[in-house]
Amino acid sequence: MSTESAKPALSQEAIVAQFQQLRNEQRNLVNSLNTLEMDLREHKTVIETLEAADPERKCFRQIGGVLCERTVKEVLPQLVENKDFIAKTIQMVTNDLSKKGSELNKFKEEHNIKIRGEHLVAEGAKGDDAEDKAENRNVLVFN
């Protein structure tokens, strides 16, 4: 009888572990997306600056940790190509992120997972109750 009661606990632990893994994957995608968006902004700024510069002016570009001397007309097309690639990658990561969010929500519904504190954010808790409820945030509950 004790082995029968141990099985559900293990399965719940496995469910929690899988849920946490899905959440971590989602966080990693968000971090990747933020990094890519920062890179895109930097590329746009550099491209705007170089477009205003003389095409024969020398500039420096770091390639794999090595600083290379080039001209603006050599570097600009490479930067535009990199910017376009980053924009496409951002679109792919955004799609992956929405799929991961759907997968996470489906997993929550299938296993009846509720996160304590989720409803508090939506309600916008105020006053002394907010302090009491803040302690209970982000706790997984299984039914």
Curated annotation (Swiss-Prot):
Protein name, entry field: Probable prefoldin subunit 2
Keywords: Chaperone
Pfam families per the UniProt record, alphabetical: Prefoldin_2 (PF01920)
GO terms of biological process kind: establishment or maintenance of neuroblast polarity; protein folding
Source superkingdom: Eukaryota
Quaternary assembly: Heterohexamer of two PFD-alpha type and four PFD-beta type subunits.
CDD domains: Prefoldin_2
One function term, GO molecular function aspect: unfolded protein binding
Signal peptide segment: none
Gene assigned in the entry: Pfdn2
Protein family membership: Belongs to the prefoldin subunit beta family.
Biological role stated in the UniProt entry: Binds specifically to cytosolic chaperonin (c-CPN) and transfers target proteins to it. Binds to nascent polypeptide chain and promotes folding in an environment in which there are many competing pathways for nonnative proteins.
